[in-house]
């Protein structure tokens, strides 16, 4: 292994660890800021902010853990020779963290749908919109839970077909989220619309990435494995494997394909999670909303 390749891997890992420290500091600052302004929030809004902050802590800590002990799940590759790097622990932490992140979005949609129900004029159209958004808020977590189950299937069996379903469900969830935000657009406070537009743009980009890059990539990997006659593990065999086996590798060739998504996942997604705890009231009173 060339020294340059090793240096690339270690530099990337150093970046991940630095981002993890920054994220903890950013969350701490957000918590301090929210606590400082707690008297300005109505009781129900303050309760939502506290839940958002707690869920964000789960995501921040989960991503921080995975930054310190990176794991390439299906290949069982790690950077640190320790049980803390095991796929079993890494995937368990990831599952909890991702459920926390999904719960943040579900909580946000529920809060916004309730605001819309209270503030919108009582028309059939507005009632349908708030009900639709509320339905999406209730479906997000179950959908992500199913996605996590398929992720575990792939990790345990080493078949990438589960990842195809998993990433498809994540893309579907993001599309439903964007659709919900667009439904609420007419009732969003005029000064909050740039924030909603940013969320919609980011969500649409994510859906496009999942549909045109991520899902096809996993499908191609699965097709290649099928063509080569790869032997897959049973879930029971996989559970033993992820608990006991990991391969230490600092080769840049092994990690290069994971660098972009892992770096973005452990940075931008975490910052978004923290920001969700700071989101102000978005739905305007009927007299303030502008079409």
Task: Label each region the model flagged.
Residues 28-38, 67-74, 91-116, 122-137, ...:
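Internal transmembrane alpha-helix with an interfacial aromatic "cap," most often the third helix
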Residues 156-186:
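Extracellular-loop-to-transmembrane junctions of the mid-late helices
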Residues 2-27:
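Hydrophobic transmembrane alpha-helical segments in integral membrane proteins
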Residues 21-33, 177-291:
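C-terminal transmembrane-bundle signature of multipass membrane proteins
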Residues 43-58, 126-141, 190-200:
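Membrane-interfacial loop-to-transmembrane alpha-helix junctions, especially the N-terminal start
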Residues 7-13, 81-96, 248-260:
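Short aromatic-rich membrane-water interface segments that cap or initiate transmembrane helices
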Residues 59-65, 141-153, 203-212:
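Aromatic-anchored segments of alpha-helical transmembrane domains
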Residues 43, 61-89, 155:
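Helix-loop junctions on the outward
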């Amino acid at each position: 292994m060339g020294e340059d390749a090793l240096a690339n891997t270690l530099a990337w890992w150093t970046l991940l660890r630095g981002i993890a420290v920054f994220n903890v500091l950013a969350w701490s600052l957000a918590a301090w800021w929210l606590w400082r302004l707690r008297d300005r929030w109505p009781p129900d809004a303050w309760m939502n902010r506290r839940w958002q902050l707690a869920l964000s802590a789960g995501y921040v800590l989960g991503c921080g853990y995975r930054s310190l002990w990176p794991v390439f799940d299906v290949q069982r590759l790690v950077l640190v020779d320790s049980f803390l790097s095991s796929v079993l622990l890494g995937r368990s932490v990831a599952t909890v963290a991702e459920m926390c992140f999904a719960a943040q979005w579900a909580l946000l949609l529920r809060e916004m749908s309730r605001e819309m129900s209270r503030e919108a004029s009582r028309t059939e159209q507005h009632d349908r919109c708030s009900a639709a958004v509320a339905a999406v808020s209730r479906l997000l977590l179950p959908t992500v839970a199913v996605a996590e189950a398929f992720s575990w299937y792939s990790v345990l069996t080493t078949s990438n077909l589960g990842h195809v379903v998993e990433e498809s469900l994540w893309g579907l969830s993001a599309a439903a989220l964007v659709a919900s935000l667009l439904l609420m657009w007419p009732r969003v406070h005029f000064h909050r619309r740039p924030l909603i537009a940013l969320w919609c743009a980011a969500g649409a980009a994510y859906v496009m990435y999942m549909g045109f890059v991520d899902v096809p990539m996993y499908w191609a990997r699965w097709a290649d494995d099928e063509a080569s006659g790869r032997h897959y593990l049973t879930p029971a065999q996989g559970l033993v494997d992820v608990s006991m086996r990991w391969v230490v590798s600092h080769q840049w060739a092994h990690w290069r394909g994971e660098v972009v998504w892992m770096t973005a996942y452990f940075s931008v997604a975490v910052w978004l999670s923290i920001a969700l705890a700071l989101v102000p009231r978005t739905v305007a009173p009927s007299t303030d909303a502008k079409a």
